[in-house]
Amino acid sequence: MAENGESSGPPRPSRGPAAAQGSAAAPAEPKIIKVTVKTPKEKEEFAVPENSSVQQFKEAISKRFKSQTDQLVLIFAGKILKDQDTLIQHGIHDGLTVHLVIKSQNRPQGQSTQPSNAAGTNTTSASTPRSNSTPISTNSNPFGLGSLGGLAGLSSLGLSSTNFSELQSQMQQQLMASPEMMIQIMENPFVQSMLSNPDLMRQLIMANPQMQQLIQRNPEISHLLNNPDIMRQTLEIARNPAMMQEMMRNQDLALSNLESIPGGYNALRRMYTDIQEPMLNAAQEQFGGNPFASVGSSSSSGEGTQPSRTENRDPLPNPWAPPPATQSSATTSTTTSTGSGSGNSSSNATGNTVAAANYVASIFSTPGMQSLLQQITENPQLIQNMLSAPYMRSMMQSLSQNPDLAAQMMLNSPLFTANPQLQEQMRPQLPAFLQQMQNPDTLSAMSNPRAMQALMQIQQGLQTLATEAPGLIPSFTPGVGVGVLGTAIGPVGPVTPIGPIGPIVPFTPIGPIGPIGPTGPAAPPGSTGSGGPTGPTVSSAAPSETTSPTSESGPNQQFIQQMVQALAGANAPQLPNPEVRFQQQLEQLNAMGFLNREANLQALIATGGDINAAIERLLGSQPS
């Protein structure tokens, strides 16, 4: 028995090492877990070992999303996962969701270091620089704004494409650069009615994919949204822009003084790392980069790394102060000084016109605007989807029926805010433009890439003529009419098919700067659209002398203005009489004590029906 015991003893120790080997082999073949990786637009499921590192997890994700590992940012439970950590350390188990943000590579240094990766990623690195050359990545729509904040039923607008994302980003940047426009939007009755409905706002917020991710990472936010008192207080603050601005200033001041408190600097760093940095990284492709990136790079380079030990008593600058118009004023002064030899009044008018032309030309000659026009030309499906949607038609119809709203939108645009001269010349053309936008021929021409290309060629040709042959375009004077267009270019007949494209001209750098802009509404009733000199000669008898000085400085603007007036003559019978159109405003002005009906009508025509601007105009014209 002893021998048997001894003989049976050795197998037991032999099983011990086998068991030890089995236990040692268990970590080598760990449990496979399924983790869902969710981006703002899609989600994928990955099967990875439980003890995988974040770097290994990123390598698996990069193959599926065709991106480099250094572009991937993984967020779980409100924290950014570091490459050296493992999934177990962060508590990532089977069935959980990890959020992914794909960063864009804007710096060429990052692209030059990509070929040093593995051979499996070299193929993607060869293809990613081409796609990353665009400002907006096709995988990026972090806030779900392609579908208008997650609103259902608006996908037919075609707003999820890359080109519209770039257009949307530019509009958002202009909106953020114009706080007055943001305030007026918040004070809009429609927006106020939306903010007064907590249930509707809660539904809109919960429908936003970005807010859904934020709620998943921070469940306490859902409790705030479900609290009616907090929602009511928040919406009351949102309805009061002045209160919101004051709260923002107080918060900025409190954060600036937080550094002087012991431990405050670390709290600021932790808040930035855990909250602000993930949100900014998620939004950087939409808004053009992290606005604090330069601050971080400068602080890491040497200066400003030590926290402040004293209280900051310097007043904060006013972030809502309008930017100084030094460049525009300098341009105006130089242009007026160059034309001072021909008289004071004519030189001022010439200087203002040239300054307005330079202002608009500088905007439309920017690479971003040229790229946008090129993308619109190359992507007719986007324009067709937008213009054929019933929402766009109803919006254009409502704007044409409410010229006050259209004029207010134009005045609030950053393009016109800093240039009153451009505002005065665009107001008379606005009703004709809105009605032309409802013309089916105009909509079909805008969705036709060849028609858009022809329009761009016309614009480029006019600019070339104005530069190379300035003596040719002065022949198109206001008194001659558009009949010269037929003799100089060809028969009058081929001019009429271009009529639907006429409203696009105000978007060109030289379109809105016609010197006879205020007479636009008076010209269409006399013109028949046939190209004869009948229409323009009615309103050009007197202005022919006053606009002669500007014909030398901007003859191409006169030519474009004549085209716009002639092409708008086709829809002239649809325009109501100004007295009928502004009947309500005239009655209000009469009740206020402005008894001169003719002066009131002229003020309303000049201001596009804006009664507040008309009152200011009437008060300014009265002798003091």
Curated annotation (Swiss-Prot):
<feature type="repeat" description="6">
    <location>
        <begin position="506"/>
        <end position="508"/>
    </location>
</feature>
<feature type="compositionally biased region" description="Low complexity">
    <location>
        <begin position="326"/>
        <end position="349"/>
    </location>
</feature>
<feature type="domain" description="STI1 2">
    <location>
        <begin position="208"/>
        <end position="247"/>
    </location>
</feature>
<dbReference type="InterPro" id="IPR029071">
    <property type="entry name" value="Ubiquitin-like_domsf"/>
</dbReference>
<feature type="region of interest" description="Disordered">
    <location>
        <begin position="512"/>
        <end position="556"/>
    </location>
</feature>
<feature type="domain" description="UBA">
    <location>
        <begin position="581"/>
        <end position="621"/>
    </location>
</feature>
<dbReference type="GO" id="GO:0042802">
    <property type="term" value="F:identical protein binding"/>
</dbReference>
<feature type="modified residue" description="N-acetylalanine">
    <location>
        <position position="2"/>
    </location>
</feature>
<keyword id="KW-0225">Disease variant</keyword>
<keyword id="KW-0007">Acetylation</keyword>
<keyword id="KW-0523">Neurodegeneration</keyword>
<comment type="function">
    <text>Plays an important role in the regulation of different protein degradation mechanisms and pathways including ubiquitin-proteasome system (UPS), autophagy and the endoplasmic reticulum-associated protein degradation (ERAD) pathway. Mediates the proteasomal targeting of misfolded or accumulated proteins for degradation by binding (via UBA domain) to their polyubiquitin chains and by interacting (via ubiquitin-like domain) with the subunits of the proteasome.</text>
</comment>
<feature type="compositionally biased region" description="Low complexity">
    <location>
        <begin position="535"/>
        <end position="553"/>
    </location>
</feature>
<keyword id="KW-0036">Amyotrophic lateral sclerosis</keyword>
<dbReference type="GO" id="GO:0016241">
    <property type="term" value="P:regulation of macroautophagy"/>
</dbReference>
<dbReference type="GO" id="GO:1900186">
    <property type="term" value="P:negative regulation of clathrin-dependent endocytosis"/>
</dbReference>
<protein>
    <recommendedName>
        <fullName>Ubiquilin-2</fullName>
    </recommendedName>
</protein>
<keyword id="KW-0072">Autophagy</keyword>
<feature type="region of interest" description="Disordered">
    <location>
        <begin position="1"/>
        <end position="32"/>
    </location>
</feature>
<dbReference type="GO" id="GO:0006511">
    <property type="term" value="P:ubiquitin-dependent protein catabolic process"/>
</dbReference>
<feature type="repeat" description="7">
    <location>
        <begin position="509"/>
        <end position="511"/>
    </location>
</feature>
<dbReference type="InterPro" id="IPR009060">
    <property type="entry name" value="UBA-like_sf"/>
</dbReference>
<feature type="domain" description="Ubiquitin-like">
    <location>
        <begin position="33"/>
        <end position="107"/>
    </location>
</feature>
<feature type="repeat" description="3">
    <location>
        <begin position="497"/>
        <end position="499"/>
    </location>
</feature>
<feature type="compositionally biased region" description="Low complexity">
    <location>
        <begin position="294"/>
        <end position="304"/>
    </location>
</feature>
<dbReference type="GO" id="GO:1904294">
    <property type="term" value="P:positive regulation of ERAD pathway"/>
</dbReference>
<feature type="repeat" description="5">
    <location>
        <begin position="503"/>
        <end position="505"/>
    </location>
</feature>
<dbReference type="InterPro" id="IPR015940">
    <property type="entry name" value="UBA"/>
</dbReference>
<dbReference type="GO" id="GO:1904021">
    <property type="term" value="P:negative regulation of G protein-coupled receptor internalization"/>
</dbReference>
<dbReference type="Pfam" id="PF00627">
    <property type="entry name" value="UBA"/>
</dbReference>
<feature type="repeat" description="1">
    <location>
        <begin position="491"/>
        <end position="493"/>
    </location>
</feature>
<dbReference type="GO" id="GO:0031593">
    <property type="term" value="F:polyubiquitin modification-dependent protein binding"/>
</dbReference>
<feature type="domain" description="STI1 1">
    <location>
        <begin position="178"/>
        <end position="206"/>
    </location>
</feature>
<dbReference type="GO" id="GO:0005776">
    <property type="term" value="C:autophagosome"/>
</dbReference>
<keyword id="KW-0472">Membrane</keyword>
<feature type="compositionally biased region" description="Polar residues">
    <location>
        <begin position="106"/>
        <end position="115"/>
    </location>
</feature>
<feature type="repeat" description="9">
    <location>
        <begin position="515"/>
        <end position="517"/>
    </location>
</feature>
<feature type="repeat" description="8">
    <location>
        <begin position="512"/>
        <end position="514"/>
    </location>
</feature>
<keyword id="KW-0968">Cytoplasmic vesicle</keyword>
<dbReference type="GO" id="GO:0036503">
    <property type="term" value="P:ERAD pathway"/>
</dbReference>
<dbReference type="Pfam" id="PF23195">
    <property type="entry name" value="UBQLN1"/>
</dbReference>
<dbReference type="GO" id="GO:0000045">
    <property type="term" value="P:autophagosome assembly"/>
</dbReference>
